[in-house]
Curated annotation (Swiss-Prot):
Pfam families: ANIS5_cation-bd. This is SXP/RAL-2-like protein 2. The gene is srlf-2. Residues 162-195 are annotated as: Disordered. It comes from the Eukaryota. PANTHER family: PRION-LIKE- Q/N-RICH -DOMAIN-BEARING PROTEIN PROTEIN (PTHR21593), PROTEIN CBG18492 (PTHR21593:SF22). Belongs to the SXP/RAL-2 family. Residues 167-195 have a biased composition (Gly residues). It comes from Caenorhabditis elegans.
């Protein structure tokens, strides 16, 4: 699993960098343009690789017929060919450690969702409080469990229970500014009319 995510991450970064090159979305001062070479999206093990070498890596990243194991083997071979094995191995080790940490945190968050959801339900069902007190209680719970509260609010919004963000960016499903309206308040799929 970690290798799959590692390969996908490397491939995504490389494709993003390739798209930002000449003819891509990077503009004249982006990677590959007339401005500084390289770019922030370049994996560290490719920084000192020639443009021709980067094209070889790119060919592997974009080859959808390779299995992940085959692609990883070819990437490691290219890293050796271009003398960046140590930097590549460090990148892989760092990415693997990061993915392990994410998996651990994800498991903890998933384990907390039921309890945090029950706490949110208790807060929202308490009618003996002001709206401000309710908001403060939710904020206090969010400070203790920020990811869990945001995940639950996101899930509720997907199910039509509440908005993810406040403000005047649209109402609940079917309400003013909700999904029955288009992206800018006009008819779905059409431009915003003259209001």
């Amino acid at each position: 699993m970690a290798q799959n995510l590692l390969f996908c991450t490397i491939a995504f970064v490389f494709v993003a960098v390739a798209m930002a090159g000449p003819g891509g979305r990077g503009g004249p001062h982006g990677p590959g343009g007339h401005g500084p070479r390289g770019g922030p999206g370049l994996p560290p093990f490719l920084v000192n690789v020639t443009a021709a070498g980067r094209k070889e890596f790119e060919a592997v990243f974009k080859n959808e017929t390779l299995t992940i194991a085959e692609a990883n083997t070819q990437i490691a071979a290219l890293a050796e060919k271009y003398g960046v094995t140590a930097t590549y191995n460090e990148f892989v080790a760092n990415r693997t450690a990061l993915l392990a940490e994410v998996k651990k945190n994800q498991t903890a968050v998933i384990g907390n969702l039921t309890a945090v959801s029950a706490q949110l339900a208790t807060i929202y069902q308490n009618k003996d409080q002001t709206r401000k007190a309710q908001e403060e209680a939710v904020d206090a719970l969010r400070k203790e469990h920020p990811v869990e509260v945001n995940a639950i609010k996101f899930i509720r919004a997907q199910l039509g229970g509440e908005k993810v963000h406040g403000g005047s960016h649209g109402g609940l499903r079917g309400g003013p500014g909700g999904p029955r309206d288009g992206p800018r308040g006009g008819p779905r799929g059409g431009p915003r009319g003259g209001r």
